[in-house]
């Protein structure tokens, strides 16, 4: 996956897809009552990026639905969206409520109440292991609303760079047994080693690991892109998706990697 980083403004959906992104990451901020309010990152953010682009969450999600509905020119290209849920503004006890409100919002504005809504896969990316009840609240709400089938399109990620063993235990608490993506990374302003990404890949490839896919962020330089592919990741999050496309076309990588499409299953671990 060539994942466009920090896509918080409706115009940027086109911009990143046109540069080659088949997935985007969008920041979601919450109000005091745990309602998803804006797609907004704020300062500080990645070097070389405008941190202040934003939309109302509902408006962004409706535009996303249009972009990922058959018949739209972007439909074939954009097949996965990571919602980077900025839950640090909430109290821990609000996590479940945030999950409920997010589910109701997406059900209405993205999935169109199950009636020919957006088709992209959705990843709920949560920065704090303590907020795992966001997942259970989200799942229960879709079940209560009679749309458990939409959970087939939803996956999970804890983005806090926690110990992989602790992440696995947290999923056990949440009752999650699949659809698990694992991120690792740091802002493009700083360098980060590959120790933890290697641990995540090892968990993915082991018989008893819970991880299905691994992605690394934020990768903007050509050499870092090569190093990341050499670590055998499934996704690269970047501010420059065209650089990822360029490197994937190099002889060393074009036989081993390709850009994923709707024919692929993002919850299935790739076996060589």
Curated annotation (Swiss-Prot):
Signal peptide: none annotated. It is an enzyme of class 4 (lyase). InterPro entries: PLC-like_Pdiesterase_TIM-brl. Its cofactor is Mg(2+). It is found in: Secreted. Its main location: secreted. Mg(2+) binds at residues 25, 27, 84. It comes from the Eukaryota. The keyword Nucleotidyltransferase does not apply. Its EC number is 4.6.1.-. Expressed by the venom gland. Keywords: Cytolysis, Dermonecrotic toxin, Disulfide bond, Hemolysis, Lipid degradation, Lipid metabolism, Lyase, Magnesium, Metal-binding, Secreted, Toxin. The active site is at residues 5, 41. GO terms for biological process: killing of cells of another organism; lipid catabolic process. Disulfide bonds join 45-51, 47-189. It catalyses: an N-(acyl)-sphingosylphosphocholine = an N-(acyl)-sphingosyl-1,3-cyclic phosphate + choline; an N-(acyl)-sphingosylphosphoethanolamine = an N-(acyl)-sphingosyl-1,3-cyclic phosphate + ethanolamine; a 1-acyl-sn-glycero-3-phosphocholine = a 1-acyl-sn-glycero-2,3-cyclic phosphate + choline; a 1-acyl-sn-glycero-3-phosphoethanolamine = a 1-acyl-sn-glycero-2,3-cyclic phosphate + ethanolamine. One of its GO terms (molecular function) is toxin activity. Binds 1 Mg(2+) ion per subunit. The keyword Disulfide bond applies. One of its GO terms (cellular component) is extracellular region. Coiled coil: none annotated. Dermonecrotic toxins cleave the phosphodiester linkage between the phosphate and headgroup of certain phospholipids (sphingolipid and lysolipid substrates), forming an alcohol (often choline) and a cyclic phosphate. This toxin acts on sphingomyelin (SM). It may also act on ceramide phosphoethanolamine (CPE), lysophosphatidylcholine (LPC) and lysophosphatidylethanolamine (LPE), but not on lysophosphatidylserine (LPS), and lysophosphatidylglycerol (LPG). It acts by transphosphatidylation, releasing exclusively cyclic phosphate products as second products. Belongs to the arthropod phospholipase D family. Class II subfamily. This is Dermonecrotic toxin LvSicTox-alphaIC1biv.
